Amino acid sequence: MQRLIQDFSIPAVFAGFITFLIGISVSAVLVIQGAQSLGANTAQISSWFWALGLAIGLSGLILSWKYKYPVATAWSTPGIALIIASTGHYDLYEAIGAFLVCGIAIAIVGFSGIFLKLLAHIPQSLTCAMLAGILLKFGIQIFSSMQTYLGFILSMLLIYLVSKRLFPRYSIVLTVILGAIICPFFIEFQLHSITWSLAQPVWMQPAFSWSALLGLALPLFVINMTSQNLPGIAMIKSYGYQPHVNQLVGWTGVAHTIFAPFGCFSVNLAAISAAVSLDDQVHPDPAKRYIAGISCGVFYILMGLFAATLVSLLMSFPQIFIVALAGIALFATISHNVALAFANVEEREAALLTFLCSASGVQFWGIGSAFWGLILGIFVLILFRLKLKK
């Protein structure tokens, strides 16, 4: 405790808050959309946020304290996008079962030390193509909405582009704040009365089906590992730290598993937002930056405890506001994954078919397009690498 007091700094606390704010600013509305797509009621949606806040907050806080470097954890935005894309194919309890299995798999793969070895067999081009395909419709949706809400969408895009140009690190946060301010000028709506109350966890009995395990749990596992944990580890390394890979991945998997029956669909290492807590602006001494990770964890815990208030606030905004924010928030993720998917010329054909199949939304035997896209891509890659006998 004495060291914690000595290492404490206001910039570190602020960095932790910004990391938290970037993590939830837009994707929080996606969580609501994802839960609703599975048929969750208001109490269950509140429980999702309670579970996510406590699982992410406790894991980030404890790991940062134990290893003395900033460990920012978060939920997976592409993961919740996958859940939304699976609308109508699984019920809430099948999805909860898939979340539970995914968490167990992450813990096993993390603690066993086979994380990097396992992922080495799946080319990055294919996983990125799968992600880009899943997310494509969210980017397209914002432009298709222009026919009805032209002024509002153009204003949102202008805010995003200007803030991206001037303040790239905080562009999403600024888009959320300024978007909320201008929204009443374009769309008539009324904020519901906000009541401050503690969230109540709701147990959702897991149900298991092969279709949900293959169509949701498996793609979610791949997404969590490839789009969050891999870049999250790389981000920590890039600032000169030596991350405890097995422990970080393993314990986030444990937190995921424990809180899955209450609505926790993912707990992973933060990737992009983690840079705020790792940067030298937090503290000149790298050994004291872990305070930012602890601070971020505390804010997530507070979010979880007051989840009911957060949900009632977010659900007061019109649907087009959520659609616009979701699309804009995913621009960077879509472009990043498209670039990586088609960077390797030799794997481009397989990546293209993975991308198109994943974007199609096709379903076979109740299994979603993300799984089939990845399987198709692996098949094409193997086919093209075979040396035909003369």
Feature map (PLM): residue ranges:
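Helix-loop-helix hairpins and the membrane-proximal interhelical loops
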Residues: M1-S46, I172-V245
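Predominant activation on well-ordered alpha-helical scaffold segments within soluble catalytic domains
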Residues: V31-A35, S59, I80-I84, I140, ...
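Intrinsically disordered, low-complexity segments enriched in polar/charged residues with Gly/Pro
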Residues: F49, I56-G57, S209, R348-E349
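Membrane-embedded alpha-helical modules
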Residues: G88-I194, S295-K390
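Structural signal for hydrophobic packing residues in well-ordered secondary-structure cores
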Residues: L21, S25, L38, I62, ...
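Residue-level signal for transmembrane alpha-helical positions in Major Facilitator Superfamily
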Residues: S25-V26, G151, S227, L269, ...
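Helix-loop-helix junctions within the multi-pass membrane cores of secondary transporters/permeases
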Residues: Q2-Q6, A12-V31, W50-L131, P243-F331
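Alpha-helix initiation/capping motif
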Residues: S9, D91, F167, S209, ...
